[in-house]
C-alpha cells in the first residue's frame, strides 16, 4: 500500500468523523415530521387537557394533562417519553391509558423541537424542559413532591435521571434506560471515537448514584435499541431502594406484549412508596 493510498484513507476517515460531528443532532434526536398533537383514539377514553408549559428560556412546550378517574391514587407521573416522534404518536396514548387505569394522573410533555413545542433539541434544553414540567406540576397543579413519580423511557430515561438527581420526588421509573448516549453511540459506531467527539452525553451512569428515592427499572429482554445490559449496569450503579424487572417484548411494546408484568410492577412499586 502506497503512502498516497494511506493518506486518502486517513483523509476519508477524518472526513467521516467531521461529518458525524456536524450531523450529531440528526443522529441523536428523532422528532419526526408530525408537529401537531393527534387526539387519542376515542375508545381509550382519555380525558386529555392540552396545556402549554413555559421553560426558563422562554419556549412553549406542548403538553397533555391526563387526570386519574375516581379511583385515583393521588400520584402523578411526569412522563419523559422516548426519542422518536411526539407525545401523541407510536402507541403512547394506549400506554397512558394503561397507566391511568392504575389510578395515576399524568403530565406528558414534548421536548423542544418535538410536536408542538418550540425550539430545537439539545441536551441542556431537554433538561430544562423536564424541569419546567416539574415546576408546572408543583406551581400550576399544586402537586406535592411526595406525590410526583418521574417516568423516563429510552432517551427520556436520561432526562428523568437528571431531573430526579436535582429535585425532590416520590419515585423514579425507568424503562429501556441507557447508561449514556456516548456509550451507546460508541457501540453503534465502534470505529469512530464517539466518546471523544460526541457533545450529547446524557451520562445517567454518572448521576444515578445521587438518586436516593425508590427506583423501578423496567427493561425488555429483546430490546435491540437499548440493550438489556445498559439497564442492568445502570441498576447496579444505583443506590437502594431499587427493583429491576425484565419484560418480554422489544424497545417500545413491552407494555402490550407483557402487560400483566409491566403494569403489575408499576402498581406494586407505587403502592410501596413510603
Please annotate each region the language model reported.
Residues 9-54:
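An N-terminal hydrophobic leader/cap segment in hydrolases
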Residues 54-136:
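Membrane-embedded segments
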Residues 136-141, 146-191:
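Primarily recognizes the serine-hydrolase "nucleophile elbow" in alpha/beta-hydrolase
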Residues 204, 213, 227-236:
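Short alpha-helix in the alpha/beta-hydrolase fold that links the catalytic acid
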Residues 210-212, 217-223:
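Short beta-strand/loop motif that positions the catalytic acidic residue
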Residues 221-226, 252-253:
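Acidic catalytic loop of the alpha/beta-hydrolase fold
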Residues 244-250:
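Short glycine-rich catalytic loops that host catalytic nucleophiles or stabilize transition states
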Residues 250-263:
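Catalytic histidine-centered segment of alpha/beta-hydrolase-like enzymes
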Amino acid at each position: 500500500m502506497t503512502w498516497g493510498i494511506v493518506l486518502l484513507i486517513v483523509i476519508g476517515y477524518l472526513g467521516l468523523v467531521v461529518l458525524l460531528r456536524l450531523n450529531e443532532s440528526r443522529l441523536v434526536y428523532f422528532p419526526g415530521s408530525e408537529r401537531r398533537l393527534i387526539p387519542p383514539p376515542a375508545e381509550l377514553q382519555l380525558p386529555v387537557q392540552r396545556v402549554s408549559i413555559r421553560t426558563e428560556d422562554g419556549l412553549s412546550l406542548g403538553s397533555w394533562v391526563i387526570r386519574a378517574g375516581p379511583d385515583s391514587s393521588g400520584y402523578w407521573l411526569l412522563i419523559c417519553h422516548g426519542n422518536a416522534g411526539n407525545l401523541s404518536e407510536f402507541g403512547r396514548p394506549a400506554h397512558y391509558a394503561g397507566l391511568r387505569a392504575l389510578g395515576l394522573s399524568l403530565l406528558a410533555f414534548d421536548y423542544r423541537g418535538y410536536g408542538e413545542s418550540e425550539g430545537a433539541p439539545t441536551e441542556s434544553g431537554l433538561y430544562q424542559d423536564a424541569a419546567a414540567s416539574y415546576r408546572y406540576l408543583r406551581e400550576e397543579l399544586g402537586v406535592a413532591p411526595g406525590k410526583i413519580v418521574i417516568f423516563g423511557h429510552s432517551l427520556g430515561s436520561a432526562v428523568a435521571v437528571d431531573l430526579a438527581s436535582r429535585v425532590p420526588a416520590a419515585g423514579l421509573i425507568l424503562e429501556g434506560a441507557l447508561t449514556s448516549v456516548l456509550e451507546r453511540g460508541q457501540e453503534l459506531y465502534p470505529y469512530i471515537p464517539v466518546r471523544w467527539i460526541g457533545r450529547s452525553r446524557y451520562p445517567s451512569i454518572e448521576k444515578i448514584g445521587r438518586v436516593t428515592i425508590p427506583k423501578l427499572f423496567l427493561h425488555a429482554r429483546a430490546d435491540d435499541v437499548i440493550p438489556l445490559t445498559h439497564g442492568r449496569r445502570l441498576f447496579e450503579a444505583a443506590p437502594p431502594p431499587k427493583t429491576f424487572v425484565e419484560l418480554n417484548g422489544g424497545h417500545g411494546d413491552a407494555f402490550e406484549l407483557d402487560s400483566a408484568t409491566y403494569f403489575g410492577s408499576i402498581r406494586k412499586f407505587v403502592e410501596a412508596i413510603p
